[in-house]
From Swiss-Prot:
<keyword id="KW-0808">Transferase</keyword>
<dbReference type="Pfam" id="PF13089">
    <property type="entry name" value="PP_kinase_N"/>
</dbReference>
<dbReference type="InterPro" id="IPR024953">
    <property type="entry name" value="PP_kinase_middle"/>
</dbReference>
<dbReference type="InterPro" id="IPR025200">
    <property type="entry name" value="PPK_C_dom2"/>
</dbReference>
<feature type="binding site">
    <location>
        <position position="45"/>
    </location>
    <ligand>
        <name>ATP</name>
    </ligand>
</feature>
<feature type="domain" description="PLD phosphodiesterase 2">
    <location>
        <begin position="585"/>
        <end position="615"/>
    </location>
</feature>
<dbReference type="InterPro" id="IPR025198">
    <property type="entry name" value="PPK_N_dom"/>
</dbReference>
<keyword id="KW-0547">Nucleotide-binding</keyword>
<comment type="function">
    <text>Catalyzes the reversible transfer of the terminal phosphate of ATP to form a long-chain polyphosphate (polyP).</text>
</comment>
<dbReference type="GO" id="GO:0009358">
    <property type="term" value="C:polyphosphate kinase complex"/>
</dbReference>
<dbReference type="GO" id="GO:0046872">
    <property type="term" value="F:metal ion binding"/>
</dbReference>
<keyword id="KW-0479">Metal-binding</keyword>
<keyword id="KW-0418">Kinase</keyword>
<dbReference type="InterPro" id="IPR036830">
    <property type="entry name" value="PP_kinase_middle_dom_sf"/>
</dbReference>
<feature type="binding site">
    <location>
        <position position="562"/>
    </location>
    <ligand>
        <name>ATP</name>
    </ligand>
</feature>
<keyword id="KW-0067">ATP-binding</keyword>
<dbReference type="Pfam" id="PF17941">
    <property type="entry name" value="PP_kinase_C_1"/>
</dbReference>
């Protein structure tokens, strides 16, 4: 059997994942406005795909061409382009379908040719007052380097000014940094009709108001376009440059990087298209994609609901964790027993409140945290600044190389440093992706450490839409090893042994192999053996080979993979014992969890790391055992609920068909809703045991 049959290219698997996102937009059981927002999510994902995955393959082609290598990457690029074009065609079909569905509910997304006289007058006034001050045409001439001025991933209108047989060209940036993309057009009182127009179409309607009096023309035409640049950048690892300076320079490289995709309105004249491709230095390896009138569909993630409540998902108020209740402070609660939070079902407020309390608690002497992505106006980060003002020793490890969050992290680094926080940037070339918080208190018996080990970021906003686990513990063995991780970050060459935590790149590969080998050995000895894995991405060939070996030995393997999956299930004699599902729903599945049967004494681990070579060998990641039996069972229960999903689970197979899982039972189980109900009952039971009153749902 060829190696290709054992391994699905991660880029094609990623496109298959985005197809699952598109399935949500097609699902008529999903509320209408949410379906439109899934189109925005699909588009945002595809933008990132071209900036990262597509760019990487293109780079490999150019390197192979210089070195005289083979054309495997060319073949892959061709397959990627073909699949992406098919998905775009399906996207266009769904968009038109959803526009019709909205109209049936008296919501109209109109263009500039569909306005009545009263609406036209309102649009002209709105344009003159709100839009025109933000519009400055960029006139295209042979002397101007357009690439120097065009912004990555911004929507533009390419304007053709025709006079007889001559044509001038200009570019207009759609100013969504200053104005909303979707504008409600006032209707007569009493009308049920709701009319929305895109900012793009307001500009199209008023093109004459921009150019009249400055240029002579007989005809004026506008066409949508967007360019995607390569997102990679090179860092100069030189002694005289700090990492902060290197990152700032790297981001400047990204601003002027060559394009990898050019999307244009399919009605654009051929001469205009050729001229723009010439000015943008579009090569035959890049994706040239004809599209509709609108680009930057990622803005549709924030599409407004101007209709009835039923057009959106029913709210699921975040649950208050009862384990914190009845204590004077969060530290007393954590010292009593380990606490597991599962977002967004639980409120992230518990973490911001923990850090707030630590910022002024007289017993707290130090706080250490590592930051990968945080909210723009993060209360948690502001509490760290408050802690310094209150005399606490605060150390923040900021990952400057968090893709697409680099600028925000640079800005936070400056604010923290100015406030007196000890800011560390880690090791150049090795991202720090662990999710750790360590608070040290001086108590009666001496110093006591409280640790947070998580699967997701300390980000107040994404914690409302990403599912993740946070383990809070006063287990001094685990807390000491969390302290050891911070020491390792500050001095990666210092020998540190981890007995409980599994830490990349120190021991993750060897420890994961050890855990999988033990299940293989148990199966070969005739014992029951099983592996349950949940990750975002599974593409590491070494770990995939080990999973194949486990399946061949008779180990039962069940996996939940949200995104890329290069393992091929269902291969005779190789992966017959492997079942893989993927769940796409209202929340983005993000935890990394491993459960091994361990001869009847299950071990449960939560982790920040996906099963990718970069996460196992080239990043600082932390995987922690769950030692509290109560929490272990809770995580196992949550995974079990997901494997019973009959609504949102798709089966991952070698054909990447994305078929929904059919389980033969009539009862519909939507796992995310079932998990919410399960955790709600857990909190209710905990309060009952404590003799406490259940909080009102409105305050949860």
């Amino acid at each position: 059997m060829s190696a290709d049959k054992f391994y699905i290219e991660k880029e094609l698997s990623w496109l298959s994942f985005n197809e699952r996102v598109l399935q949500e937009a097609a699902d008529k059981t999903v509320p209408l406005i949410e379906r439109i927002r899934f189109l925005g999510i699909f588009s945002n994902n595809l933008d990132e795909f071209y900036k990262v995955r597509f760019s990487d393959v293109k780079r490999r082609i150019l390197i192979n061409r210089e070195q005289g290598g083979n054309d495997i990457s060319k073949h892959l690029l061709s397959k990627m382009q073909s699949k992406a074009l098919k998905l775009n065609e399906r996207f266009d079909e769904l968009y038109n379908e959803l526009i019709r569905d909205m109209a049936r509910r008296h919501i109209f997304l109109v263009n500039e040719s569909q306005l009545d006289e009263a609406q036209q007058k309102w649009i002209i006034k709105y344009f003159q007052k709100e839009v025109l001050p933000h519009i400055t045409p960029l006139m295209l001439t042979d002397e101007i380097d357009v690439l120097q001025f065009l912004k990555d991933e911004y929507a533009y209108i390419a304007v053709e000014l025709k006079q007889q047989e001559q044509a001038k060209y200009a570019l207009l940036e759609i100013p969504t940094d200053h104005l909303p993309r979707f504008i409600m057009v006032p209707e007569q009182k009493g009308k049920r009709k709701k009319t929305i127009i895109l900012l793009d179409n307001i500009i199209r309607f008023c093109l004459n108001d921009i150019f009249r009096g400055f240029f002579d023309y007989d005809e004026l035409n506008g066409y949508a376009m967007k360019m995607t640049r390569d997102a990679e950048y090179d860092l100069r690892h030189e002694v005289e440059y700090s990492l902060l300076e290197q990152m700032s320079e790297g981001l400047s490289q990204r601003l002027t990087a060559l394009p990898v995709r050019f999307v244009y309105e399919r009605d654009m004249p051929e001469d205009m298209l050729k001229y723009l491709c010439y000015k943008l230095k579009i090569s035959h390896y890049d994706s040239l994609i004809p599209g509709g009138r609108y680009h930057n569909f990622k803005d549709f993630i924030a599409f407004p609901n101007v209709g009835r409540d039923y057009l959106e998902n029913k709210p699921l108020p975040p649950l208050a964790c009862a384990d914190f209740e009845g204590y004077a402070n969060a530290f007393d609660a954590i010292r009593n027993q380990d606490i597991l939070l599962h977002y967004p079902y639980h409120s992230f407020e518990h973490i911001t409140e923990l850090v707030r309390q630590a910022s002024f608690d007289p017993k707290v002497v130090s706080i250490k945290i590592n930051v990968y992505r945080v909210a723009k106006n993060s209360r948690l980060m502001n509490s760290l600044i408050d802690a310094v003002h209150n005399g606490k020793r605060v150390t923040v490890v900021v990952e400057l190389q968090a893709r697409f969050d680099e600028e925000a992290n640079i800005e936070w680094s400056k604010r923290l440093t100015d406030a007196g926080v000890h800011v560390i940037f880690g090791v150049p070339g090795m991202k720090i992706h662990a999710k750790l918080l360590l608070i040290t208190r001086r108590e009666e018996q001496g110093f006591v450490r409280y640790a947070h080990i998580g699967t997701g970021n300390f980000h107040e906003r994404t914690a409302r839409i990403y599912t993740d686990f946070s383990l809070l513990t006063a287990d001094q063995e685990l807390a000491a090893e969390v302290r050891g991780v911070f020491s390792y970050i500050m001095n990666p060459f210092r020998p540190i042994k981890f007995r409980h935590l599994i830490v990349s790149p120190r021991n993750s590969r060897s420890q994961l192999y050890r855990l999988l080998d033990r299940e293989i050995h148990n199966a070969q000895a005739g014992k029951k053996a099983s592996i349950t894995l949940k990750v975002n991405n599974l593409v590491d060939k070494g770990l995939i080979s080990k999973l194949y070996a486990a399946s061949s030995a008779g180990v039962k393997i069940r996996m939940i993979i949200r995104g890329m999956c290069s393992l091929v299930p269902g291969l005779e004699g190789i992966s017959e014992n492997i079942e893989i599902i993927s769940i796409i729903d209202r929340f983005l599945e993000h935890p990394r969890v491993l459960v091994v049967h361990n001869d009847g004494d299950p071990q449960v681990f939560i982790s920040s790391a996906d099963w990718m070579e970069r996460n196992i060998d080239n990043r600082i990641e932390v995987m922690s055992p769950v030692r509290d039996a109560r929490i272990k069972q809770r995580i196992i229960d949550i995974l079990s609920i997901q494997f019973t999903d009959t609504v949102k689970a798709r089966r991952i197979d070698k054909e990447m068909s994305n078929n929904y899982v059919e389980r033969g039972n009539r009862k519909k189980i939507r796992s995310q809703i079932a998990i919410y109900d399960y955790l709600k009952n857990v909190e209710k039971h905990t309060r009952k045991q404590k003799g406490q009153v259940e909080p009102n749902d409105n305050n949860e």
